[in-house]
Structure formats: C-alpha cells, structure tokens
C-alpha cells in the first residue's frame, strides 16, 4: 500500500557481536584453575572442586564497597575482580578491603597458585568477556556512577547479572530485569539478601 516491495529483517548488532565474542572466548588456564581448584599441570588424582565463582566486571569503588565486605564474611565462593581502572593505587585499595583471604593477581600468579586462592584480581586488559565463562554470578560495575557497563557479555553465559541503580537508560539491563535474569541492588542489604538467595538456589 505504501510502495514497499522488499523488506530485509535485520538483527540487533549488539547481540550478534556479543555472541561472536562468546564463540571466540579465550581459554584462560589461570581462571580455570581458580574455578576448579586444580591446575592442568597437576596430577589427575587432585580433586576438582568446581568452586562457585562471583565475577565482578568493570567495578568501581562504590561497587567494591558493597560486594567485598560480603565476601569477607561468607565462605564457599571465590571472587574474581576485573576493575574498570587498574591503576596500581586502585589495586592496592582493593587489597586493603579484602580481609582473611588469599589473593593473587593475574599477571603475577600461576595456575597452581590460583588454584589455592580465594580472590583473583585481573590486573590487565582484554580478558573480561572471556572471564565470565568461569563464573556463576556476575556483577556489572558503574551502576552507582555514570551508568552500568556491558551486561550482555555476562548474560550470554546464562548467569544471573547484578548491577546498581543507574541502569534505566540501558535497554539490555531493562530486558534482563524483566526476564528475571538481572537484579538491581541499591544497598549492601539488597546485595546480601540477593546473594543469600542465590547461594541457596
């Protein structure tokens, strides 16, 4: 009626791109050892634990002030942190917040050491999208600042995705909230209650 004779159905390039990234995910022996509790170089007799791993991606201090105290108080999970800013002074700040845990840094550790660690800090760029493969729950930083970072890179691995309140302008985050795959937190109490629920699932 309006003169259109040919129509192409085009997908969302954001989703197409993140699926391509997933398919090209890097194998990270250090992250694998961190999750399983055993390095590939170790004897097959060493038991695999398959620890629960919480991946914090592109986090900022307001995010870390919520999730780090929780993991200081709760056992049974391992914490993998990839900050948005990896300046040395910022990494030292994180180290000062972590209490009673064995912490290793990605560029300074081995799979054997990572297998024994409680916290793995990523102190280099280019690994985040591949890291989510080794997690069970993801936290996306920025929600207490200018806005959350990429939620799709985590969601594509079929894990719960947690983020702060500044998410209203992000279509992907809104979709996750509506589908039940995303969770907004505003306070430590929100986070603690949510994690307790996820731990019991």
Where do the protein language model's features map onto the residues?
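Nucleotide-activated sugar donor-binding and catalytic core shared by glycosyltransferases
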Residues: 1-201
């Amino acid at each position: 009626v309006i003169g259109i004779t040919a129509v192409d159905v085009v997908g969302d390039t954001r989703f197409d791109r993140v699926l391509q990234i997933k398919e090209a995910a890097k194998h990270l022996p250090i992250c694998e050892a961190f999750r399983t509790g055993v390095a590939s170089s170790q004897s097959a007799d060493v038991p695999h634990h398959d620890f629960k791993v919480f991946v914090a991606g592109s986090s900022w201090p307001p995010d870390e002030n919520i999730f780090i105290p929780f993991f200081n108080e709760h056992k049974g999970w391992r914490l993998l942190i990839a900050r948005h800013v990896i300046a040395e002074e910022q990494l030292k700040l994180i180290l000062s917040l972590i209490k009673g845990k064995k912490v290793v840094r990605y560029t300074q550790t081995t799979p054997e050491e990572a297998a024994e660690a409680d916290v793995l800090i990523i102190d280099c760029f280019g690994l985040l999208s591949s890291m989510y493969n080794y997690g069970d729950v993801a936290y996306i930083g920025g929600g207490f600042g200018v806005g959350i970072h990429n939620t799709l890179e985590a969601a594509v691995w079929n894990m719960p995705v947690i983020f702060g309140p500044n998410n209203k302008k992000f279509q992907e985050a809104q979709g996750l909230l509506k589908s039940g795959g995303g969770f907004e937190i505003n306070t430590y109490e929100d986070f603690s209650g949510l994690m307790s629920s996820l731990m019991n699932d």
